[in-house]
């Protein structure tokens, strides 16, 4: 066999030309790219944080403006000289303050008395005055002021991004800050270099919100990181150069032998084990080729068992996705019912616990049809509490059919889809009809809801064949994919609908 010395010389020259020089260029480009990307990312996050903060503060201002406007007529009959009216007024203001995502204080001041939730007597001159209203009560005219001490959003921006916030008036006087470099009442002068900032208008009084960042705080660390990366890359190139030279010198014959054995293994003509001429790390590859060839038959035999396990894992994964939006809405309903109707809230909690126990049961992914129908009835019962009994459920399933076994939670997505996409201003009637024919279960779910246009219906049908989690119709998509995993191509799901005439879903599955 020919010597590989010329190849080693060529490899040495190639490594020097194609590795050393590119590494140097990568360091230069990396330094420039790091700075450019850093500036771009910071500008983007500052813009995003400025917009989020502006939206939050304006929403709070709008909320109190709407609240005061709606209550002014009623407040004209309120006499704040009476303790009962005082207590009622305090509760109203505290409720509005506590509903906002910020630490707020109100100050209601008249000619002879005042009310506030600033029990710690904090200095309100260091807070941002969100809004101010003149309100006429029965006994006197009062001035209502709403102050903001801080918000979780601004704290998180300061903590996580190192960005500071200012609120200034039309004369650039600082009204609010969370940075020690500025103080309330001083004039704001934008730094000339090393700072990035963005400003947005807050209200009609020309107050502006400013979010800014000192780029000197992190640019030095970034440069140091690039220097370290450059040194590491240079060391790796040197090590790779030496290793490649030795491999070209010592392992050429063994590489060719390995290539020949790979070709023999592809054609299933590989004989008994033969070690390489030189003992090296390539011997691991040589051993692996023989081990792979010997285990090929065992691998083929285990494929079928592995596929079954994979299907079980996929089924369990889909079952664990218990409608987080439904659970969230139900918990909100319970929270609303607890002070109004504790007994109803207790009933909802019991129904929800039974549904969770049913959906999270891992002993088997198949259940009796009667259990599935009971689960659906509980689901609709909870939905009726949310929607004021606007859903009517009718089940037409013979007794012998209810003893059949189906996949757990195979019907619930159909009912959920009917409620979510079919409910309108009129009562929604959902009919479930189940029949058994020739070892197949035929399930029809019909609703008299708003239906779908032809184009919308076509999009829904196409969404059944999209990847899981890649569609807005997750319930039907999960159901379709799960049915294929569990029953193969024998499962069928057809959807028919007309605008303002309801929707019909026909579901056919083989019996387990």
Curated annotation (Swiss-Prot):
The keyword ATP-binding applies. InterPro entries: Bact_2-comp_sensor_kinase (IPR050640), HATPase_C_sf (IPR036890), Sig_transdc_His_kin_internal (IPR010559), YpdA-like_HATPase (IPR047965). The chain crosses the membrane at residues 20-40, 222-242. It holds the Pfam family His_kinase. It is found in: Cell membrane. Gene3D superfamilies: Histidine kinase-like ATPase, C-terminal domain. Residues 297-512 form the Histidine kinase domain. Autophosphorylated. Its main location: membrane. It is a multi-pass membrane protein. Its EC number is 2.7.13.3. One of its GO terms (cellular component) is plasma membrane. Keywords: ATP-binding, Cell membrane, Kinase, Membrane, Nucleotide-binding, Phosphoprotein, Transferase, Transmembrane, Transmembrane helix, Two-component regulatory system. Disulfide bonds: none annotated. It catalyses: ATP + protein L-histidine = ADP + protein N-phospho-L-histidine. One of its GO terms (molecular function) is phosphorelay sensor kinase activity. The modification Phosphohistidine is found at residue 325. PANTHER family: SENSOR HISTIDINE KINASE YPDA, SENSOR PROTEIN KINASE HPTS. Probable member of the two-component regulatory system SERP2405/SERP2406. May activate SERP2406 by phosphorylation. This is Uncharacterized sensor-like histidine kinase SERP2405.
């Amino acid at each position: 066999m020919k010597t590989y010395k010329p190849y080693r010389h060529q490899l040495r020259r190639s490594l020097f030309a194609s590795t050393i020089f590119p590494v140097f260029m990568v360091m230069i480009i990396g330094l420039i790219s790091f700075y450019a990307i850093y500036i771009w990312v910071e500008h983007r996050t500052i813009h995003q944080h400025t917009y989020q903060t502006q939206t939050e503060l304006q929403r709070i201002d709008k909320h109190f403006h709407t609240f005061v406007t709606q209550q002014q007529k009623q407040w004209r009959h309120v006499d704040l000289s009476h303790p009962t009216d005082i207590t009622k007024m305090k509760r109203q203001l505290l409720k509005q303050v506590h509903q906002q995502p910020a630490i707020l204080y109100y100050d209601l001041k008249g000619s002879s008395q005042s009310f506030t939730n600033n029990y710690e007597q904090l200095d309100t001159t260091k807070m941002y005055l969100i809004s101010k209203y003149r309100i006429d009560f029965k006994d006197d005219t009062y001035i209502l002021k709403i102050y903001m001490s801080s918000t979780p959003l601004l704290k998180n921006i300061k903590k996580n991004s190192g960005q500071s916030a200012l609120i200034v008036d039309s004369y650039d006087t600082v009204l609010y800050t969370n940075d020690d470099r500025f103080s309330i009442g001083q004039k704001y002068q934008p730094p000339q270099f090393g700072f990035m900032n963005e400003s947005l208008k807050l209200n009609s009084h020309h107050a502006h919100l400013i979010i800014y960042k000192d780029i000197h705080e992190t640019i030095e660390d970034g440069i140091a990181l690039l220097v370290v990366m450059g040194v590491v890359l240079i060391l790796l190139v040197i090590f790779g150069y030496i290793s490649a030279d030795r491999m070209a010198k010592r392992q050429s014959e063994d590489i060719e032998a390995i290539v020949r054995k790979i070709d023999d293994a592809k054609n299933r003509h590989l004989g008994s084990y033969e070690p390489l001429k030189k003992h090296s790390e390539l011997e691991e590859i040589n051993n692996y080729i023989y081990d792979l060839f010997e285990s090929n038959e065992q691998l083929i035999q285990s494929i079928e068992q592995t596929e079954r396990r994979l299907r079980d894992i996929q089924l369990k994964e889909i079952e664990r996705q218990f409608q987080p939006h439904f659970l969230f809405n139900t918990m909100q309903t319970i929270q609303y019912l607890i002070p109004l109707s504790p007994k109803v809230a207790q009933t909802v909690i019991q129904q929800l616990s039974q549904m969770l126990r049913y959906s999270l049961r891992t002993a088997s992914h198949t259940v009796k049809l009667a259990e599935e129908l009971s689960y659906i009835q509980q689901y609709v019962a909870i939905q009726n509490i949310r929607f004021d009994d606007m859903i009517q459920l009718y089940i037409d399933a013979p007794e012998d059919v209810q003893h059949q076994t189906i996949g757990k939670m195979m019907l619930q997505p159909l009912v959920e889809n009917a409620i979510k996409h079919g409910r309108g201003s009129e009562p929604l009637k959902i009919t479930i009809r189940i029949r058994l024919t020739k070892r197949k279960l035929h399930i029809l779910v019909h609703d008299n809801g708003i239906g779908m246009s032809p184009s919308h219906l076509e999009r829904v049908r196409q969404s059944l064949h999209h990847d899981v989690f890649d569609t807005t119709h997750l319930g039907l998509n999960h159901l379709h994919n799960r049915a294929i995993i569990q029953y193969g191509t024998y499962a069928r799901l057809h959807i028919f609908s007309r605008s303002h005439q309801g929707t019909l879903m026909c579901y056919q599955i083989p019996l387990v």
